[in-house]
């Protein structure tokens, strides 16, 4: 247990809203490393995230250099190369009656192009997996985790990074591609990823090399008041 901070030390609504409104997805970073004390502050904030069933079953993989992130991305693209049959035309055609129209459209319109972008860009020396970020964190669960827990913890980490002037971006496409099959298991083992997990998110951090002056006004699909 610890003593709760005084209320006057907490941000007010306007400050919190300003932090959230200023956030833009940043994928271009200076080469400067994220200091160890800032990494610990991000983790300290993420540890405060609420969970469905205490104690937390959230796990975090930390890649704390551009070189580590490039190595992970290279291995991920090599792994995807061996799975290209998974998004081949013949396989998608065969699976359409089994998994339905919506899943077919998802794989045809998003997953297959994603494979091409990841693999093709890496062959050109461009990392579109984690963008050679100075820092990335992968939040994932265990077989017993509330599916929302890793996502909430990742969100807290992102906000903490933003509060210290770091650029951040959530990356959701890596996680589902390393969950199933023998090749995925070997990939996870190589990188010390302990469990499969229903939900998981990567967050990348770094000192931004781009500056935005405008934000995007976001809305929900619907808001129903009963």
Question: What are the language-model segments listed below?
Answer:
Residues 1-226:
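Acidic, surface-exposed loops and disordered segments
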């Amino acid at each position: 247990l610890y003593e709760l901070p005084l209320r006057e030390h907490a941000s007010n609504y306007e400050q919190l809203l300003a932090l959230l409104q200023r956030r833009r997805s940043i994928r271009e970073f200076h080469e400067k490393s994220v200091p160890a004390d800032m990494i610990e502050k991000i983790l300290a904030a993420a540890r405060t995230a609420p969970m469905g069933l205490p104690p937390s079953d959230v796990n975090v993989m930390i890649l704390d250099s551009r070189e580590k992130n490039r190595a992970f991305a290279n291995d991920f693209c090599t792994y995807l190369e061996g799975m290209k049959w998974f998004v081949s035309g013949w396989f998608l055609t065969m699976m359409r009656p089994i998994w339905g129209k919506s899943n077919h459209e998802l794989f045809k319109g998003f997953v297959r192009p994603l494979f091409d972008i990841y693999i093709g860009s890496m062959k050109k020396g461009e990392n579109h997996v984690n963008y050679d970020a100075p820092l990335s964190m992968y939040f994932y669960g265990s077989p017993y985790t509330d599916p929302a827990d890793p996502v909430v913890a990742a969100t807290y980490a992102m906000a903490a990074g933003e509060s210290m002037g770091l650029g951040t971006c959530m990356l959701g496409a890596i996680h589902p591609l390393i969950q199933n099959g023998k090749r995925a298991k070997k990939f996870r083992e190589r990188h010390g990823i302990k469990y499969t997990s229903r939900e998981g998110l990567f967050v990348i951090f770094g000192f931004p090399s781009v500056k935005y002056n405008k934000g995007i006004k976001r809305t929900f699909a619907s808001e129903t008041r009963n």
